[in-house]
Amino acid sequence: MTVNLTLQHASEIIGQDNVDLTLAAGASAKVSNLTVASEWLTNNTGYLVTISVNDKSGNVLSSKRAGLSVEDDWTVFPRYGIVAGSPTDQNSILVKNLEAYRKELELMKSMNINSYFFYDAYNEATDPFPEGVDSFVQKWNTWSHTQVDTKAVKELVDQVHKSGAVAMLYNMISADSNPKNPALPLAALAYNFYDSFGKKGEPMTYTIGDNPTQVYYDPANPDWQKYIAGVMKSAMDRMGFDGWQGDTIGDNRVTDYEHRNSTDEADSHMMSDSYASFINAMKDLIGEKYYITINDVNGGNDDKLAKARQDVVYNELWTNGGSVIPGRMQVAYGDLKARIDMVRNKTGKSLIVGAYMEEPGIDYTVPGGKATNGAGKDALAGKPLQADATLLVDATVAAAGGYHMSIAALANANAALNVLQSAYYPTQYLSVAKDTIRKLYNYQQFITAYENLLRGEGVTNSTQAVSTKNASGEILSKDALGVTGDQVWTFAKSGKGFSTVQMINMMGINAGWHNEEGYADNKTPDAQENLTVRLSLAGKTAQEAAKIADQVYVTSPDDWATSSMKKAQASLETDENGQPVLVISVPKLTLWNMLYIKEDTTATPVEPVTNQAGKKVDNTVTSEASSETAKSENTTVNKGSEAPTDTKPSVEAPKLDETTKPAPSVDELVNSAAVPVAIAVSETAHDKKDDNSVSNTDQGTVASDSITTPASEAASTAASTVSSEVSESVTVSSEPSETENSSEASTSESATPTTTAISESHAVVEPVASLTESESQASTSLVSETTSTIVSVAPSEVSESTSEEVILMDYQKTSIVGIDSL
């Protein structure tokens, strides 16, 4: 048998390595010398890593894929996660729960999270971590009296750093948790110009019931700026945080103390008017080494923030906010895309979106709780979060060029990992099913592997006409804005030398993203097959169009593809103006597909890459090829308004106070010129498929940690080093388990190579395929510390000629970080 590693960028094979093995029946082996060489990698680039096990005839016995991001700047492609208090212990962050947090962080690491903000981990807004205090109870938190152990926070920050990620300290940018005894004089506070956060002329105050919880300063006040800068710098220094995730309560028209009773609007200003100056003041006062961003609730202040030196852009979006699309609120998937587009156009950055699906409503003043919406009924009935409700928002935001912040580590005894459903992060009523975590894992790999296609530099909305039809010729793409349901929402984007077509399935469902009615508002669309996408190639010559038609691929994070990029059938027609039209056959659509159209018609082939052993590896796979790359179905080569409408909706517990130092240097993390991939391989018998395809129950995987690779521009290629981490062993059984039907696990390593320019390689040409169910790669996300896959051969079930041709994984017998507790 052969164990193969393929590194791919888009449709290009960048590099390959393989190891040949001979195993006797019942034997096992560990492969530890597969490598990803640093010269294969370039900075701020996403790759797909495929590891497969093939028999001696080239048939794929097992395979897995993972996204790899090589980056020296996490802000280019932010993948934001949350650490917050445990609902099991009064929303507290405690030392006794560290092990649970560690498991969640390992799983999030495997999902390529490169930045975390620690939510409500502070003592008070004006004194986040009192010096010399090992543990404190949040006095302002009257509903749960949360306790925070500073040792627990510090250890979790350290773990985040060890994973190569950054840790942000959450805090409000202008709040004081002591309304009756604020830290600064009353002259520094912001005063309501209208009745809003209290009465006109009174200090702007957030109240829960009759209890004032926070009072707010004017962010433009220089005394406040100096005070909070000193407080935050001290807290971040002591606890090891890398930056500040600033929060706002929403926009409001305010005055200073002197003009608090004025009725002249000229004496007032919007709080958002001072966001940019506040951020810039923090950069000057705290220092450029600390990252900072603020939550512009519901967006809309892009012009004001355009000159702000914030490192990433973060918007918490609500359905009560006005859409970028005129005359609407931001209630539909298309409204999310419109906001992401606006931020990209104004700032050039990829928007981090906080958008909470379902948001169960439960009135706990009633004994046992009373549901106030459908999602609340689901929670009281013990139902889990709808997977597709989450995935459709993930898909929409990623396809638009943003990142949906949704995954949280909460040390929740009822969930191995949490998906945010409400604005107060420790309170997530709906459990998260194991299969939902698996699908989320696959989406995170996809978003990482194809980050340059989704939100790379120069990627913009395309002006080329695009449409989708079903097999009967009915147009399914009815609304390009994405605000109408029961359609295949189809839009095109373009980048340097390529185009993509994003397909979001809303057939049979509405376009609302919030889904507060839960299962009563089903978010699982009707799966589609045999679709035809037509993309205008207006302006291309016939010769250019013909070449482009031979460079069309389809991929998806869903189970039928799990990130594999497949050559698509494509032909050419002409429109009424005689312009070429690309006609693409799409075999299947579950939730989200991406078509990749390579438009560079002038590139010339380069020498094939050379593997570690010095053997030539052909990186062009023909449709007749029988190599492991061709055989593997998973292979790729690679305004705020006058009244405070832009405020957060009220929540059961207030979302009061939320918040990366550069990742460890290359010198600290690396010590060799290539990424070793350790794999333990063995074999288990199953019925061999005559058609060489591998069904769901036939598929095995090679498991390892997620691959997020910070890179250093300063280090030379010769000195570049990489360390590889992989997690606990994957065990194997010859007896099928109920989880074998989802058999695509994660391939991931932690690697740190230097920036290296990479020459283009040949395009992958896979067999033009109509994808079958046997290619479905539903799998359990596996996180491993030692990338080992044990494959055992059963002598009584395997003939001498086939003993090296089969593999089977039993995930229920797998000891995997973050999965055992599912």
From Swiss-Prot:
Q: Which regions are flagged for Low complexity bias?
A: 619-636, 706-761
Record key words, sorted: Glycosidase, Hydrolase, Signal
**Does the record carry Hydrolase as a key word?**
yes
Protein name per Swiss-Prot or TrEMBL: Dextranase
Concerning InterPro entries, the annotation shows: Glyco_hydro_66 (IPR025092), Glyco_hydro_b (IPR013780), Glycoside_hydrolase_SF (IPR017853), Ig-like_fold (IPR013783)
Which EC main class describes this enzyme?
A: hydrolase
Q: What is its EC number?
A: 3.2.1.11
Quote the biased-composition stretches of kind Polar residues, using this chain's numbering: 693-705, 771-788
Q: Which reaction does it catalyse?
A: Endohydrolysis of (1->6)-alpha-D-glucosidic linkages in dextran
Q: Which domain of life is it from?
A: Bacteria
Q: Which organism is it from?
A: Streptococcus salivarius
